[in-house]
């Protein structure tokens, strides 16, 4: 499985704290989103949100980014602009650097 960062943002108007329709989606899907993602072979590792910036970062594992794209199109993606980015851990970066330096 690959590691991905999902960077999202929404307008102040689309914020679930300000928008009843978005809030309804959050309340409907939020409590069960980890389970729903798991059914699509997506493991949600962490979910971070910045209320002041109206942005979020979720870290997930999945076999490919298209699974994530499809899942979010029916969920959080309805009211957010999304960017799905492949990630590696910092320890992976260190290991790659060691290989380049023949450690």
Label the model's feature ranges.
Residues 1-54, 63-66, 92-103:
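Short S/T/G/P-rich N-terminal loop/turn motif that feeds into the first structured element of a domain
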Residues 56-58:
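A generic structural motif
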Residues 61-93:
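An amphipathic, aromatic/His-enriched active-site/gating alpha helix that lines ligand/cofactor pockets
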């Amino acid at each position: 499985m690959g590691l991905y960062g999902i960077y999202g943002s929404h307008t102040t108007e689309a914020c679930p704290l300000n928008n009843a329709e978005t809030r309804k989606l959050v309340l409907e899907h939020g409590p069960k989103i980890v389970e729903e993602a798991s059914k699509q072979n997506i493991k949600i590792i962490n979910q971070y949100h910045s209320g002041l910036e109206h942005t979020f970062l979720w870290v997930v594992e999945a076999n490919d980014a298209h699974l994530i794209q499809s899942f979010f199109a029916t969920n959080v993606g309805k009211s957010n602009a999304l960017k799905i980015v492949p990630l590696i851990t910092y320890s992976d970066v260190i290991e790659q650097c060691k290989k380049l330096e023949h450690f």
